[in-house]
Swiss-Prot record:
It comes from Arabidopsis thaliana. The modification Phosphothreonine is found at T293. Keywords: ATP-binding, Coiled coil, Leucine-rich repeat, Nucleotide-binding, Phosphoprotein, Plant defense, Repeat. This is Probable disease resistance protein At5g45510. Residues 171-205, 212-224, 263-279, 286-322 have a biased composition (Basic and acidic residues). The keyword Coiled coil applies. One of its GO terms (biological process) is defense response. LRR repeats lie at residues 654-676, 677-699, 702-724, 725-747, 785-806, 813-835, 836-856, 861-883, 884-906, 907-929, 931-951. The keyword Phosphoprotein applies.
Length: 1222
């Protein structure tokens, strides 16, 4: 037989093994892989495919099955979802850190430790206290591993030899016994042709193989073997581990070699393209055996992904061993390094086919959720006879990870306190959510360009993974912080790989998800709470030694939030860190209200500290920093001691990351120029900082992330233009800022956010005369990595262009272009190059009068188009090409008179043109828009269009007619019947006219004059309330407006004492600080929060037509609301609850009017609220869950037109319109 070590093998073709009766396909495949690996020679099996198909799950099954093979004496797991720096410099400079990490991980699997580790700190000599060289540690550890593995191998060899001798002896004895029974004469004749008994026994035993069947090689061909599992190859390749880190040479005595490799499909394609990852990994271990979880630990993704669902392996010829193999060689059917040539078998296709409905059912029913599953899972899906459970499992697209994540998310949901407290209602909402998400699945787009540029989007969102995401609850104390942490985790792991769990929580704090941080300990506890929820939901998976990886199948879900992950992160630290542990934060712990570096032994240096101002006040800053000269990462939250910058700037010369957050006392940062090694700098909330010198940033050539916000600077230092390594540039909420640096050649930029710069009038050069740089920020076509661009709230008149006539390349990476409330923006450049846009927000750009036809071309991924409040008189006809569009928002477009044909936009879910007073026509029919949920024509002149003929998405549909009348039903067929019935009866329309006349007669003359100049109401609720939003937008006499406002708020309060607030008006800081009465109109939640951060003496608050607010005081410090006595809320269509209002001891009067979504007002009943007025809240059921309001005898409760309210006897007013007309 030829020596397998010298023979160049071809790819082995394995015939499918027939399944045993009732045996699942994945079990059959597992046995097939073990049989292949256990065959003769060096074997290598590949499992390649997209995230979530069960590659790691199959590897775990193989590990368990291989342990039954007597010839497999050891399995070693190496998780390659981390970065090893193993390039030529690594070898040349003899750096052993990553090699140590690798062998330390192997030793931990074998329960082996170095002598140094086994020695207690107190028992070490002084010489040992000095850091022992990693090279010496390796010399100590490697022999232990070698000895252990050889002993395991020798034990198996000895057992095989003993078994062989035993069988030979038994065969000989059996043969001898048979001889005695044979006739002597016949025996004598037969003996001449027979071998001796021992030889006969040997010949017979060679037919025995492990498992007892002659289906593989004989025992003489099969040898004891070590199984090496390389899981989630990508961040580091097989070749890097085996050759550069020396594992091949280290295992030279353990042949034949058996290797099982799992690899994400897009990682394979990226590696073939030469996208070789460099950088050092974090300190977490990556070689330990993985916990028994479904899905797989997959980290790395490349910018360009393979659109096919299956991976293929090319066959390459054997290369000479003296020539280092290329990247392509690593993925061939043979892989050669050292003296070994592998037979490679690709089982990727069989893996895809091994998980179907039967396996999905088995996996789901084995989950903990199955026993607590609500009964409605066995109800039929509307319109079919199929049970909801079966229908749901079919939607998994054969992804084990999807089943696993959904089962865990459902289990977490039904075991939550809120679910148990109101089980019936929560169960109903859960069922509705499941039916809605499953029914909203779209078909895959057929456009080839879309598929090639973005296969993730082209393949469509997996409805099961999307459902798991939709199950996140954002109504708890931390609100939507869990969403920030979830999206950050996915992004972080793609750039950096696996991470220790404490490091991950610290990353969340650094990114600002728990701001304001008054206590680092409290922020860490909140982070740990979210971390555990993500673990429980299956979104994060924890390996041994608390190393964390995400469920990367969740990358299939597209972030639906307006700003996305990059819009919510302060640093984009993963772009700075990149998996290089020298640029990370190191191993940390939370202790004494600080987060700092773990000190494993005496004298270990501290390189990271995060500390709040409260904790810092306990010490003298200069003394505190004196002993921290090795510090590299420093986070200061709300520091209140001064002057604190000089206390560390002259000592911390090694600082790489500096965060100074929410420091009102900071007036200058010039001393920071001494910190020349900075790669990350944040100075935010420093309201006293008014100037940064022009050359300031010349001191930081390595800066990769810069965050300046909440400052009073008027000019941005031009030296920012020289930061060639910059990835994230955030200069937001600087209202006095008048210019920007020239950033058009900073080709590494991924985030540019200058939102809230209300004084910024141009992004070009604002200098005069000869000094003017006419090319400054003229063209962004070089910023090919840019993903997020936000100019919201600025006063810029024009944008840079995004293309060059000589370059045809597209800026496909840009997913969000946000220009909300850029009120001076007059026109847009061609947006055609921005082919990857998902969200385009131009709302509130009141000067925008024109959009080029090409702006909507090549926008196959655009999900949300918001043109509300613009002055566009027409839309480009190319709008019909936005095939992926889900939301079309054209509210208050007062000059728009027609919308071109949108009939092809069959993925639309929301069409809102409310308040567009001149709009009279929408071309095309809505008949084929089967996913449509909301149509709002109120305040327009549009006739009722042809509504969808069928309904695919299962949820409540809402149609608001031009006259403001609302129709809500489960299907469009029912809504059409209601509309037809309403037309024939003509009753509701006549009632509305009478009511309108009655209300008009009661209004002051001044208000009627104002309304006569305003457009039609933008929502059905505006029939019974003056549209103050329109009052703010119509140019009318100021005195007339003041009189009207007095009637709207409270005639008893002098108008000059009421501070009027909308989304964009400028407010005097001193007036805001002393304001006692505030009136909000059309404000975002962020605007309300920012006001209450400064206004702390408010007694009366009126909120009107703030359409996006779910909780008016979300994120507001309750201490700032202690003085509140009167709260009036009108026309808040999204209002769902009012947080911690029960703690407002001075609240005397609360009014809710036209808030259709709210069902329960308070989490708990206020102790001393005397007056509560409720009007036109059509879904309001309770004031407090589980508490009857009638038991509160001191409460003066008035209820009008709240049909579902059951706590109190309602007041019936004949002159109030029905709830659906409010």
């Amino acid at each position: 037989m030829s020596d397998p070590l010298k023979m160049a093998a071809e790819t082995e073709e394995i015939k499918p093994v027939p399944a045993a009766m009732g045996e699942k396909k994945d079990v059959v495949l597992c046995k097939k892989i073990v049989e292949t690996l256990g065959g003769g020679g060096d074997q290598r099996v590949l499992l390649v495919g997209e995230a979530g198909i069960g590659k790691t799950r199959m590897a775990q099954m193989v590990d368990k099955e291989a342990s039954k093979d007597v010839l497999c004496y050891q399995t070693l797991w190496l998780h390659l979802n981390r970065k090893f720096k193993v390039n030529d410099n690594y070898i040349k400079e003899k750096k052993f850190e990553d090699e140590w990490s690798l062998y330390e991980n192997i030793a931990s699997q074998l329960s082996l430790y170095s002598d140094f580790e086994e020695t207690e700190v107190g028992e070490r000599d002084e010489d040992e206290e000095e850091e022992k060289k990693v090279e010496d540690l390796l010399k100590d550890l490697k022999p232990k591993i070698e000895k252990y593995l050889l002993e395991k191998k020798e034990a198996v060899v000895k057992k095989l030899e003993d078994d062989k001798k035993k069988k030979e002896k038994e065969a000989a004895e059996k043969l001898e016994a048979e001889k005695k029974l044979v006739d002597p004469a016949a025996k004598k004749a037969k003996d001449h042709g027979n071998k001796n008994p021992t030889d006969a026994a040997k010949e017979k035993t060679t037919q025995v193989v492990a498992g007892g069947e002659d289906k593989a090689q004989t025992s003489s061909e099969r040898k004891p073997y070590l199984l090496l599992i390389l899981d989630d190859e990508g961040m580091t390749s097989e070749y890097e581990v085996m050759v550069h880190l020396g594992l091949e040479d280290f295992l030279k005595d353990h042949t034949p070699r058996k290797i099982l490799i799992t690899r994400r499909q897009e990682t394979e394609e990226a590696t073939k393209s030469g996208e070789h990852a460099e950088g050092e990994a974090n300190d977490s271990q990556s070689g330990e055996k993985k916990e028994d979880t479904d899905g797989e630990d997959e980290i790395r993704s490349a910018d360009k992904e393979e659109p096919e669902s299956q991976a293929r392996v090319k066959t390459e010829e054997k290369h000479e061993k003296v020539v280092p193999p290329t990247i392509d060689d690593l993925w061939g059917s043979t892989n050669t390094y050292g003296e070994i040539t592998f037979q490679t078998t690709n089982e990727s296709q069989d893996l895809l086919e091994s998980f179907n409905l039967k396996e999905a059912e088995a996996l789901f029913t084995s989950s903990m959720f199955f026993k607590d599953m609500p009964n409605f899972f066995f109800d039929p899906v509307p319109g079919t006879d199929e049970k909801l459970l079966n229908h749901m499992l079919k939607k998994s697209k054969s992804l084990p990870a999807a089943i696993n994540v959904l089962a865990k998310s459902l289990e977490y949901t039904v075991k939550s306190k809120s679910y148990k407290l109101n089980k019936d209602e929560e169960e109903r909402l859960l069922k509705e959510k499941i039916e809605m998400v499953l029914s909203a699945e779209r078909g895959n787009p057929s456009d080839q360009e879309s598929s090639s540029e973005s296969p993730k989007k082209a393949s469509g969102e997996n409805p099961i993974l999307l459902l798991a995401y939709k199950l996140f609850k954002t109504d708890g104390p931390l609100k939507d912080t869990i969403l920030d942490c979830f999206w950050h985790s996915l992004d972080f792991f793609e750039h950096c790989g696996c991470v220790y769990y404490r490091d991950l929580i610290t990353q969340w704090i650094l990114e600002g998800y728990f701001d304001p941080v008054r206590s680092v300990e409290k922020a860490y506890q909140d982070g740990h709470s979210i971390f555990m929820e993500l673990i429980d939901r299956g979104m994060l998976k924890i390996q041994e030694n608390n190393v964390v990886v995400p469920e990367m199948a969740m990358r299939n879900v597209i972030d639906p939030r307006r700003g996305g992950h990059l819009g919510k992160s302060r640093l984009g630290f993963s772009r700075v860190y990149g998996g290089n542990k020298r640029k990370g934060i190191g191993k940390i712990t939370q202790l004494d209200d600080m987060i700092k570096t773990v000190q494993a032994k005496k004298g270990d240096k501290i390189t990271t500290i995060l500390v709040s101002g409260d904790r810092l006040r306990r010490v003298t800053p200069k003394k505190f920093f004196k002993n921290l000269k090795e510090l590299e990462v420093l986070g200061l939250f709300e520091p209140t001691v001064k002057p604190f910058v000089p206390s560390f700037s002259d000592q911390l010369k090694l600082l790489r990351v500096l965060i100074i957050r929410d420091c009102d006392l900071l007036k200058s940062i010039e001393e920071l120029k001494a910190l020349t090694k900075l790669n990350t700098l944040e100075v935010s909330g420093a309201s006293s900082l008014s100037k940064i010198s022009e050359k300031f940033f010349e001191s930081f050539p390595e800066l990769r992330s810069l965050h300046l916000s909440g400052l009073k600077i008027e000019s941005s230092p031009p030296s920012i233009s020289g930061l060639k390594e910059l990835h994230c540039l955030i200069i937001k909420d600087c209202p006095l800022l008048q210019d920007l640096p020239n950033i058009q050649e900073l080709v590494n930029l991924e985030v540019v956010d200058v939102s809230g710069a209300s004084g910024l009038r141009t992004c070009f050069d604002n200098a005069d005369g000869a000094k003017k740089n006419k090319s400054k920020n003229k063209n962004f076509y070089l910023l090919t990595k840019l993903q997020h661009l936000d100019f919201s709230g600025s006063q810029i008149e024009r944008l840079p262009i995004f293309q060059d006539s000589a370059v045809a390349a597209k800026l496909h990476s840009l997913t969000r272009l946000l220009l909300r409330n850029c009120s001076k923006l007059r026109r847009l450049p061609s947006l055609k190059p921005l082919s990857g846009l998902q969200i385009l927000d131009l709302s509130g750009t009141t000067s925008l009068v024109e959009m080029l036809e090409v702006c909507f071309e090549d926008k196959l991924e655009l999900k949300t188009l918001n043109l509300s409040g613009t002055n566009l008189s027409e839309l480009a006809t190319t709008i019909e090409d936005l095939s992926s569009l889900n939301e079309l928002l054209l509210r208050d477009c007062i000059n728009l008179d027609a919308i071109p044909n949108i009939e092809k936009l069959e993925n639309l879910e929301v069409i809102d043109v409310s308040g567009s007073a001149k709009l009279a026509k929408i071309e095309g029919s809505f008949e084929k828009m089967f996913y449509l949920r909301v149509v709002d024509l109120s305040g327009t002149q549009v006739e009722t269009p042809e509504l969808p003929a069928d309904t695919k998405i299962h949820c409540l549909k809402r149609f608001t007619r031009a006259d403001g009348k609302c129709f809500e039903r489960d299907t469009w067929r029912e809504i059409k019947e209601d509309i037809e019935r309403d037309r024939s009866e003509n009753a509701s329309s006549s009632d509305a006219v009478v009511i309108s006349q009655e209300i008009t007669e009661k209004k002051p003359v001044e208000i009627r004059e104002v309304e006569s100049n305003a457009p039609r109401a933008s929502d059905c609720t505006e029939k019974v309330d003056v549209n103050k939003e329109r009052l703010l937008k119509v140019p009318i006499d100021r005195a007339l407006y003041q009189k009207a406002l007095t009637s709207l708020v409270d005639s008893k309060i002098p108008q000059e004492e009421v501070l009027e607030i909308n989304e964009t008006n400028k407010l005097d800081e001193e007036a805001l600080a002393s304001a006692e009465f505030v009136s909000f109109v059309d404000c975002t939640p962020e605007r309300v929060k920012s006001i209450f951060e400064k206004a702390k003496l408010v007694k009366g608050c009126w909120l009107r037509m703030c359409f996006d607010i779910k909780d008016p005081f979300d994120g507001v410090d309750e201490e700032n609301l202690k003085s509140l006595e009167t709260l009036s809320i009108t026309n808040l269509l999204s209002l769902e609850t009012i947080s911690f209002i029960a703690k407002l001891e001075n609240l005397k009067n609360l009014s809710l009017d036209c808030c259709p979504k709210i069902k329960t007002i308070f989490p708990e009943m206020p102790a001393s609220l005397p007056v509560l007025n409720l009007k036109h809240c059509e879904n309001l059921e309770k004031v407090v869950v589980g508490v009857e309001v009638s038991t509160h005898t001191n409460l003066d409760l008035k209820v009008e037109n709240c049909p579902k309210f059951g706590d109190y006897v309602m007041v019936d007013h004949s002159d109030v319109p029905p709830p659906h007309e409010c």
